[in-house]
Amino acid sequence: MAKKVLTQIKLQIPAGKATPAPPVGPALGQHGVNIMQFCKEFNERTAKDAGLIIPVVITVYSDRSFTFITKTPPASVLLKKAAGIESGSPKPNKQKVATLKRDVIKKIAEQKMPDLTAASLEAAMRTIEGTAKSMGIVVED
């Protein structure tokens, strides 16, 4: 018989830096999950992605065991890293903060493809370009 799913918890945690402090501790503690075990496993699995924020979906079962799936970093984090900026523009339609080439957008779209609902790479690129535009990043050929 399969284990009964108690809940799913969605968090965004810096890669390799999960600690029992908030937001991880309270989110897992209220469901009786072994927080240190999660932190250790998450940090091992994400050590190679240091500096990025990694979304994680934690499935908690009725016997207090858990499994988790890590996803690709948010498009905005990847765009900021590629452009070398700290944050997007406060007024993206008037004030531009960076310029990226289309091939950089393509690499980000390829990386995000498993988590996007886009049917093709071109559609994924348009999605990433829209995120870039809303952050004040100009995309050029």
From Swiss-Prot:
One matching Pfam family: Ribosomal_L11_N
CDD domains per record: Ribosomal_L11 (cd00349)
InterPro entries referenced in this protein's UniProt entry, alphabetically: Ribosomal_uL11 (IPR000911), Ribosomal_uL11_bac-typ (IPR006519), Ribosomal_uL11_C (IPR020783), Ribosomal_uL11_C_sf (IPR036769), Ribosomal_uL11_CS (IPR020785), Ribosomal_uL11_N (IPR020784), Ribosomal_uL11_N_sf (IPR036796)
Molecular-function GO terms, alphabetical: large ribosomal subunit rRNA binding; structural constituent of ribosome
GO CC terms, sorted: cytosolic large ribosomal subunit
UniProt KW keywords: Methylation, Ribonucleoprotein, Ribosomal protein, RNA-binding, rRNA-binding
Processing after translation: One or more lysine residues are methylated.
An example Gene Ontology biological process: translation
PROSITE patterns in the cross-refs: RIBOSOMAL_L11
Function statement: Forms part of the ribosomal stalk which helps the ribosome interact with GTP-bound translation factors.
Quaternary structure, from the entry: Part of the ribosomal stalk of the 50S ribosomal subunit. Interacts with L10 and the large rRNA to form the base of the stalk. L10 forms an elongated spine to which L12 dimers bind in a sequential fashion forming a multimeric L10(L12)X complex.
Stated family: Belongs to the universal ribosomal protein uL11 family.
Official protein name in the record: Large ribosomal subunit protein uL11
Native species: Caldicellulosiruptor bescii (strain ATCC BAA-1888 / DSM 6725 / KCTC 15123 / Z-1320)
Primary gene name: rplK
